[in-house]
A protein has these predicted regions:
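Exposed, low-structure sequence patches enriched in small/polar residues
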Residues: 1-189
Length: 189
């Protein structure tokens, strides 16, 4: 399986009159390729491996983001499942971080996300997810944990409960900007 796409958010398109659109200066391209293994074996019903890539540009032609991810999924014989996703972001520039200033470049980032879940066809099921991402220069990281439980008393009704915890310390926070000798400067903490 494969998919690809192109997203264009033009600065000329006036959607921000209501104030919801943070950035309209964006051109995004993405590509996903997935291989599926549909023939059951002794231990799984189906599995898949995938690769994804996307880039983001602004309307000045600057490459602002480059991201690659590798993912896999296994549906076991008992219909439980396990997933893994690894992400590599060698380039992260954000135009809006300095609030009107130049682009801000974050350091390279790598992450891994794992999940496992019980059979969703059963009346009760549970899913557990863990994620960890770390910037190369140790200025950003996050760790996330979540668990969800489902109960389906009838075919027409399903009840779910999910709780999660996320810790995302950032050593790069915008404080303010100023001007000295006609040169703009930005203060980060």
């Amino acid at each position: 399986l494969y998919s690809g796409g192109f997203i264009w958010r033009s600065p000329e398109l006036e959607l921000n009159d209501v104030g919801f659109l943070r950035q309209a200066d964006e051109i995004r391209q993405y590509l996903d390729v997935k291989g599926q293994f549909l023939t059951p074996t002794d231990w799984y019903r189906g599995a898949s491996l995938g690769f994804g890539q996307f880039t983001t540009y602004d309307f000045e032609g600057n490459l602002n983001r480059l991201q690659f991810d590798l993912n896999g999924n296994v549906n076991f014989k008992n219909n439980w499942e396990a997933n893994i996703r690894m992400i590599h972001k060698p380039l992260i520039n954000i135009n809006t971080y300095l609030r009107g200033g130049p682009r801000w470049r974050f350091s390279e980032e790598n992450g891994i996300f794992l999940s496992a879940g019980s059979d969703r066809r059963k009346r009760y099921n549970v899913n557990v997810r863990i994620g960890k991402s770390q910037a190369k220069e140790d200025n950003f990281s996050f760790t996330s944990y979540s668990i969800s439980m489902g109960y389906q008393p009838t075919n027409a009704l399903r009840l779910s409960l999910e709780t999660s915890y996320r810790n995302a310390p950032s050593k790069t926070q915008y404080v303010t900007q100023g001007n000295f000798l006609n040169k703009n400067f930005y203060i980060l903490a």
